[in-house]
Amino acid sequence: MAISFLCVFLITFVSLIFFAKKIKRSKWNLPPSPPKFPVIGNLHQIGELPHRSLQHLAERYGPVMLLHFGFVPITVVSSREAAEEVLRTHDLDCCSRPKLVGTRLLSRDFKDIGFTPYGNEWKARRKFALRELFCLKKVQSFRHIREEECNFLVKQLSESAVDRSPVDLSKSLFWLTASILFRVALGQNFHESDFIDKEKIEELVFEAETALASFTCSDFFPVAGLGWLVDWFSGQHKRLNDVFYKLDALFQHVIDDHLNPGRSKEHEDIIDSMLDVIHKQGEDSSLELTIDHIKGFLANIFLAGIDTGAITMIWAVTELVKNPKLIKKVQGDIREQLGSNKERITEEDIEKVPYLKMVIKETFRLHPAAPLILPRETMAHIKVQGYDIPPKRRILVNVSAIGRDPKLWTNPKEFDPERFMDSFVDYRGQHYELLPFGSGRRICPGMPMGIAAVELGLLNLLYFFDWKLPDGMTHKDIDTEEAGTLTIVKKVPLKLVPVRVQ
């Protein structure tokens, strides 16, 4: 009798909780949502280019909408006003990260900055990174590396210009940014290292981004064992683990090299700075770092830092070459400001060419390398544009859609750098119509390092060379078709003929 009474009581109690939650949710003003299928939710509405699919859905259902990816509800934000509420007004309440299978693995169980959920450990790591790794003084200390690598690229392109052979700029600029980053972060020089192979690094970046972007069933169907089983059969587990072991081998090699007492070094790189903290941890316990933390940091740099700068430069050159009058104007302004007899470009020259800075802003607007800010997760109940967003809800900000919003930009699909003339709009996270690096507590800490490489790289390309199309091509043949998921590249590699300007 007592057991029967207890069972009835428990069933009644659980039912009351369930209905109380249902009544509470019914009072919420949830964002509009497209019709969904059972189980899969709205997954069938997401195509090969997720940012474009989400943009088209937002045009129909509004700038704040609720989607369901499997069993997981996701709020998608596609307007400046809504982005400002998420990234500034409610920044503290929604600056955590969801714990995803791929990010957990590659960050070594969240021992990084980019993927780690919000908390005291994350705050200590980010503070260290901003103070020791990405501060202005540190960025400037790597200036000679950026200038040397750009000069090396100019020499390579000049050799190709002799016989007027087409150059795959997509590869050349990837190797430029990779060379800079490997010297800055890992102390490894592509031109001298026997261990680092450029082609293999490019393949590994592609593999890592593809594995992270591939559908991981466990992230959207968190049913005990079911998602894991599907991922095992689909090969997603193997893809992620293959990337993990390749990255681990690379990082372990360079860390071992740094621990070698006889190692000669040209400068103190990021690994040196982190190893120094590990050696001094007995004196200062405010930050705890291990070798796994170094590898987690390096994974962030590897995934976010290598190809994004190259992608930005490729899109900028693509848009300029498509418009002969525009590239002539940009190059004319650069050469007039710098003179015609420079043998080498330095970073001091960048401040003399404001038109180039407008070109970069316009590239960020029309072609952000990462069109969707890494997903945030709410830690409290918030309201965005009057809609309720409960705790533990993932939020995606579609910066690509905001950059093409006709309410914000005149002729948004046109590449027009002069729209930024006499404009205060900047890309450093304070203007929510232009967010290539995000904003708030989760803004990309490597932004100054990335911007420095993009500005100097583009300045060298546009000062020293005119750019011609391969035989048989016209400007109308240059397409801007996109490819990718985490980062968006030009689908057809950009091949041009460099003509050295004397």
From Swiss-Prot:
The chain crosses the membrane at residues 1-21. The keyword Hydrolase does not apply. InterPro entries: Cyt_P450 (IPR001128), Cyt_P450_CS (IPR017972), Cyt_P450_E_grp-I (IPR002401), Cyt_P450_sf (IPR036396). Heme binds at residue 444. It is an enzyme of class 1 (oxidoreductase). GO terms for molecular function: heme binding; iron ion binding; monooxygenase activity; oxidoreductase activity, acting on paired donors, with incorporation or reduction of molecular oxygen. It comes from the Eukaryota. Gene3D superfamilies: Cytochrome P450. Pfam families: p450. Its main location: membrane. CDD domains: CYP71-like. It is found in: Membrane. Disulfide bonds: none annotated. Its EC number is 1.14.-.-. Belongs to the cytochrome P450 family. This is Cytochrome P450 71B19. The lineage of its organism: Eukaryota, Viridiplantae, Streptophyta, Embryophyta, Tracheophyta.
